[in-house]
Structures are given as C-alpha cells and as structure tokens.
Amino acid sequence: MIYRRGQTVLVQGITGKQGTFWAEKMIECGTTVIGGVNPKRAGETHIGVPIYGSAVEAARHTRCDVSVIFIPPALAKDAIIDAIDAGVGTIVTLTEHVPSHDVLEIFARLKGSNSRIVGPNTAGLVTPGEGFIGIMPGHNTNVFKPGSVGVISRSGSLGTLMCLNLTRAGHGQSAFIGIGGDPIIGTTSLDALMALDRDERTTAVVLVGEIGGSMEEAAAEYARTMRKPVFSFIAGRSSPPDKKMGHAGAIVSGGRGGYASKRAALERAGVRVADTPAEIAAFLSEINTRERVFAAE
C-alpha cells in the first residue's frame, strides 16, 4: 500500500473526465501508468496509453501492480472484482458510497486472492518525489516534499492539510496513505500503521483520524509497541452525536467512536495527540531539536 517508483498502474475509468485529468497528473508526476480500462473503447489509445476491455485483458498484455478505480458507485463492484480476477496486488478505490452489500461481496471475493483494497472512498497514495495514485495533489511540491514522515488519513482534505503543514515546517513525507472515509474499508489505520512501521524510509508516523468507528483505538494498541514516534490529530472534537460529519463513516452513535475515547486510547498508548494539524509539525520539530542536542553532547 506504499507506492514505489516503477510499480505499474492501471486506470479503470481512464476515459472519463476525472479519470483523464488525474491520470495525466499521475503521469506528469512520474507514476508508471501502463493502461486504462473501458470496455467500449478497447484497442484505442487515450492520453498516450492503451485502452483494454477489462483488467483481466490488460493483465494478459502487461504487468499490473496497482489499479485505481474511477468508476461510479453502482458499477464499482464489477470493476473491482475484475481487478481481483486479474491478480492486481493493490486496488485503490476512489469511489464513495459503494453500496455496503457490494463491499461485502467484494471482501468475500478477496479471500484467497493476493489483492488488497485501499478504500472505498480513499483519496489515494502519494510518495513524494516518486509518484502518486488517486486524487491527492501529489504533483504539488508546496504540499508534498520527500522526507521521512509517514502520514495516514481517512480524509483526503485533512491529509492534504496535514502534509501542507509538515512541508511548510520542513518535514517531508516518506509516504501518504489515504485509507478512505466509508464505513467499511479494506485497509484500516492499523494496517497502514504496520506498513509504515516496517518501512525503512519512515522514521515517524502521523495518524490523522476522525470520529466514528474504532480504527484509531485499534491502531493505538499497536502504536504502543512501536519504536518509531507516532503522533495524531483527531477531527470532530465538537461534532454532535448521531450526525454524519462529511464521511459516511464519521458518525458517533450510541456513545461509540467519539473524540474523547479515541484521544484517551491514543494517549494511553504513548501517542502524542495534537489539537490542530499545525501542532503536529511543532511536535516533530521538538524531536529534531532534541536529537541535534543529544548528537552535540
């Protein structure tokens, strides 16, 4: 789920307006886009890449490490299952509001496969200086800068804001992982945290969470075991109960998934929790200052 230069990307829905725009941005940024999928335009070329009738057909002609889904909710299930059948390793699903029954059917199909779903409703993956997949502004050097801080976020906009604050403070990113804001997703905060813990380029991790669900609490238990420092910002401190705030998964119901419980779990695990995104950058600067002092002694 960490994008690396040279991984090949198939864009399902490449000929649509959004698919075209973002595929061009990905290519400009260095992402290796090897083809697109549109059953009605198979055999054509679009923005310089070949169009296939399906992901399975594409996999017969070229290596497909990652697929990105620019497909409407009602059709997303078939596109994702096509990518699973093609043996694609990582399927980045940008589509929001994929029907829950469809998501459960997709997860059942994943069993026994080598595929992983990132999303639904993810903004994508970014590795500054190497490329990006999805709809994050990975091409914007004011937002993303190569470095050693891994960032995990359920929200694309909050993830962008966090990376902007980090970059302005001089803290570059080793990877950005957008896990998605829908209630049922294929890659959790814990999954992403474990991946960044294993990543040799990452020396610190920022977890951008939000109200709803219990993913941050589960990630906190793992963070307790990590040697790398973990910091967090949780959005939704003032959100009223039983009201969806932005994402379908961002809702506090029956006293579960609230801001206070998430913050308490993270702090018990030794995670430093910020009140604002800008404060995270200050925490990282404190660590860098202490390390320089220790090195000089």
Where do the model's predicted regions map?
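Catalytic-core regions of core metabolic enzymes
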Residues: M1-E297
